[in-house]
């Protein structure tokens, strides 16, 4: 078994699907939380000047979705066929498109923007993008006979999207009373015993 070390800030955000995957598969790894002070020194040593970084036996890999996809392929969660892999990849790509808008909100909150600006971003930027994004996810779920987004078993797309739904819930962008199909999906993924146990004991954050 390779030696894995995941480096990211002390938050869920872009690294959490990686952590969930490791936890679900009981793969040992070091979950290293980088402080703001450490980051200024560490940044020049990283491949892209960004976190997360996954170290595998000393080799450094960057870009969160590339890392997650790499592990999904390695651990059999990328899809059972080339077509399933393409569907899973496309769902995650759509998620990345949405995150561009969502991060405008979380950044505004993090950096202490005034309430008027935060509300403007919420209502004029994020909510329209959220509506489009969730409509697409609902279309995949409507076609699914298994309750998973792709095929008849869990893929990395399920892990990524379910974790993003957590962030939407925590920030007031999702109401399961109005999104029953998404609630069923969310509960299905979070009822997987290993994921359920991990989520119950992890250090939480709003993103």
UniProtKB/Swiss-Prot annotation:
Annotated positions binding glutathione: 8, 39, 43, 49-51, 63-64
Domain GST C-terminal: 81-207
GO biological process, one term: glutathione metabolic process
Enzyme class: transferase
Substrates-to-products reaction catalysed: RX + glutathione = an S-substituted glutathione + a halide anion + H(+)
Induction note: By paraquat. Induced by white light exposure.
Molecular function as annotated in GO: glutathione transferase activity
Domain GST N-terminal: from-to ranges: 2-79
Matching Gene3D superfamilies: 1.20.1050.10, Glutaredoxin (3.40.30.10)
Region forming the signal peptide: none
Gene Ontology CC entries for this record: contractile muscle fiber
E.C. no: 2.5.1.18
Keywords on record: Transferase
The protein's role, per its UniProt record: Conjugation of reduced glutathione to a wide number of exogenous and endogenous hydrophobic electrophiles. May play a role in the detoxification of reactive oxygen species produced during pathogenic bacterial infection.
Family as reported in the entry's similarity comment: Belongs to the GST superfamily. Sigma family.
Name recorded for this polypeptide: Glutathione S-transferase 4
Species in which this protein is naturally found: Caenorhabditis elegans
Record lineage: Eukaryota, Metazoa, Ecdysozoa, Nematoda, Chromadorea
Gene name per UniProt: gst-4
């Amino acid at each position: 078994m390779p030696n894995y070390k995941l480096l990211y800030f002390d938050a869920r955000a872009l690294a959490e699907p990686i952590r969930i995957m490791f936890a679900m598969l009981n793969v040992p790894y070091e979950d290293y939380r980088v402080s703001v002070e450490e980051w200024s020194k560490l940044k020049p040593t990283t491949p892209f000047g960004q976190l997360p970084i996954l170290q595998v036996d000393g080799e450094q890999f960057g870009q969160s979705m590339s890392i997650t996809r790499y592990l999904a392929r390695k651990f059999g969660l990328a899809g059972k066929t080339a077509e399933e892999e393409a569907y899973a990849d496309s769902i995650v790509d759509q998620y990345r498109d949405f995150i561009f808008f969502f991060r405008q909100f979380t950044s505004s909150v993090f950096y202490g923007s005034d309430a008027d600006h935060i509300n403007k971003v919420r209502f004029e930027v994020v909510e329209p993008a959220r509506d489009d994004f969730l409509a697409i996810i609902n279309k995949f779920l409507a076609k699914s006979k298994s309750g998973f987004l792709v095929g008849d078993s869990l893929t990395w797309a399920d892990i990524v999207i379910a974790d993003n739904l957590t962030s939407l819930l925590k920030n007031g962008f999702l109401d399961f009373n109005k999104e029953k199909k998404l609630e069923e999906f969310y509960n299905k993924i979070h009822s997987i015993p290993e994921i359920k146990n991990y989520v119950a004991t992890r250090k939480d954050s709003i993103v």
